[in-house]
Amino acid sequence: MQIVFKATQRVEQGTGASRRLRRAGQIPGIIYGADTDAQAITVDHNELYHLLKKETFHASVLMIELEGAKHTVVLRDVQWHPYKQQVLHLDFQRIDAGHQLHLKVPLHFINNDTNPAVKLGGCMISHTMTELDIACLPANLPEFIEVDLQSLEAGQSIHVSQLKLPEGVEAVHHGEGDPVVATALTVKGGAAEATEGEVAA
């Protein structure tokens, strides 16, 4: 089910206006993109604070209801207070159904505890990555990418190229090589060490 929330047009801008909004329980934000003028908005802090705690909110197509109009967006940036549980600012990007999105989605690791190298071989599995940069059309955007650890052997690694991505989804590599997603490390003397067979990044 698509996440929908309401926003209000923000008229006053600047540091002072933003502080007043935050004191009133509102979060200043902006909607931009899709060859349309940027719109300054405010949203309810309590509502968005709880939505931000949901993993799906960060990797889903969202719907903002603003002054009678609906905007299809993705979350692009969140600014948090350095020590308070307070959201300071939000950036949303409008999306076009016919244009590819570039977004980070979380990785979900399965079968860690049933992996033979963990159960019988005295290994532990190190998760090198927790999210993956992808490119896809909005309709193909997955909430997460599953990483199956069942067959990972001691000293071996799973690389990005080995992930089973949903149809229409591509991994976006930054730089050269094939990044490591997870590695099975042997445990010696209380510390985890890669065996000689470990595949380098």
Swiss-Prot record:
GO terms for molecular function: 5S rRNA binding; structural constituent of ribosome. GO terms for cellular component: cytosolic large ribosomal subunit. Pfam families: Ribosomal_L25p (PF01386), Ribosomal_TL5_C (PF14693). Keywords: Ribonucleoprotein, Ribosomal protein, RNA-binding, rRNA-binding. One of its GO terms (biological process) is translation. InterPro entries: Rbsml_bL25/Gln-tRNA_synth_N, Ribosomal_bL25/Gln-tRNA_synth, Ribosomal_bL25_b-dom, Ribosomal_bL25_C, Ribosomal_bL25_long, Ribosomal_bL25_short, Ribosomal_L25_dom, Ribosomal_uL5_bac-type. The keyword RNA-binding applies. Belongs to the bacterial ribosomal protein bL25 family. CTC subfamily. This is one of the proteins that binds to the 5S RNA in the ribosome where it forms part of the central protuberance. NCBIfam families: bL25_bact_ctc (TIGR00731), PRK05618.1-2 (NF004128), PRK05618.1-5 (NF004130), PRK05943.1 (NF004612). Part of the 50S ribosomal subunit; part of the 5S rRNA/L5/L18/L25 subcomplex. Contacts the 5S rRNA. Binds to the 5S rRNA independently of L5 and L18. This is Large ribosomal subunit protein bL25. The gene is rplY.
